[in-house]
A protein has these predicted regions:
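Short, well-ordered coil/turn elements that cap or connect secondary structure elements
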Residues: 39-41, 94, 117, 194
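A general structural motif
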Residues: 18, 94-96, 119-120
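Glycine-rich phosphate-binding loop used to anchor ATP phosphates in small-molecule kinases
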Residues: 85-111
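Short beta-strand segments
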Residues: 23-25, 98-101, 124-126
Length: 195
């Protein structure tokens, strides 16, 4: 059964004839620049952060963990559906080499061999954390609002929690375990520890 699933996934991947690499890492560490450089090669596609990992997580939670479906489990079908997210998401791309970008790959490394039957190849751009925090603060000072006119997500969280808008508080929030930098560092450490 397990081998049959792997064969179906292999066939689907070869049908679309694509090679997949994954990009994660720390925020404001050059992944957008790296994507632009990779895209100069006509055989490569590296877009903005994709919803592939969050979609797989949501499907896994729904198909494998939802009480409504546990009475009639279909693990093989669930695995095939989850495994189809990556190739289907990029089925419109003609390039044979795809770089899927999402910081969550570092905490879901097991998805790559588990669902796609390929060895994980994850590019993780990194940068000194002080430089990352400085970059965030500079970005906020240049433009405190998001594209849609709302206040930036960092200040929004501080205001919601009645915390003064200071650079120290912004940095503390970003580096906290719940912050974008803290989560990314933790994910990267987890991926490195698990090999």
């Amino acid at each position: 059964m397990k081998e049959m699933i792997k064969e179906i996934i292999r066939e689907e991947m070869s049908r679309l004839n694509k090679t997949y690499y994954f990009m994660a890492g720390l925020p404001r560490s050059g992944s957008t620049l790296l994507s632009s450089i990779l895209n100069q090669n006509p055989r490569f596609y590296s877009g903005p952060s994709s919803p592939v990992v969050p979609t797989m997580i949501a499907l896994e939670n729904s198909l494998a963990n939802d009480e409504l479906f546990l009475g009639y489990p279909k693990p093989q079908q669930a695995k095939e559906i989850i495994a189809s997210v990556l190739p289907q998401y990029y089925s419109d791309r003609p390039e044979p080499v795809i770089f899927d970008k999402n910081r969550s790959w570092t905490v879901r490394m097991e998805y790559i061999p588990g669902y796609f039957d390929i060895a994980p190849k994850v590019i993780c751009p990194v940068r000194d954390t002080a430089e990352i925090l400085t970059s965030f603060i500079s970005m906020i000072r240049r433009n405190p609002y998001q594209v849609d006119g709302r206040i930036n997500f960092i200040d929004e969280m501080l205001i919601k929690n009645n915390i003064p808008l200071t650079d120290d508080n912004r940095c503390e929030l970003l580096a906290s375990p719940a912050g974008i930098l803290g989560q990314s560092v933790e994910g990267l450490q987890k991926a490195l520890m698990e090999g």
